[in-house]
Amino acid sequence: LTATDIERGLKLLAWSREDLLKTVEGLDAKKLDQTYPNERWSIAGILKHIGGAECWYLDRLELALPREQIPGEPFARLKVSRARLNEVLPTLEGSKQVAGVDGELWSPRKVLRRALWHERDHIEHIRKLL
């Protein structure tokens, strides 16, 4: 990743998270925990999944926080996982690291790309449920 890639990535991550939080703003606990037919998760479950996925992506490069530091509450998990991603990305400038994990290759660029795509995908998922 170049410095420009990281700068742009951090901006896109911030905008995406802003969109996510605006999408769920004002939803009460009942709505967050509501289940939907043919859906794996409630909205709270989707939020928890997004945060968990960011931790998982970082784990591919051995950069994740220890599991015991990852909150279970969805909004806290989102905050902690994104803070870690924002902390780690600038340290990856110029990194040529490629890690093979479970038969899949991971690089800093792939982690950034997946985190961005995954959150956008689930923002649309939540919007469809609402």
Segments and roles (model prediction):
Residues 10, 21-22, 29-75, 100-130:
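Short, contiguous alpha-helical
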Residues 69-89:
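Short, Lys/Arg-rich amphipathic alpha-helical interaction segments
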Residues 27-30, 92:
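Short secondary-structure junctions and interdomain/linker hinges
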Residues 1-25:
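Active-site-adjacent scaffolding segments
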Residues 87-98:
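Transmembrane alpha-helical segments of integral membrane proteins
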Residues 3-6, 40-44, 78-81:
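Short, mixed-charge, low-aromatic patches
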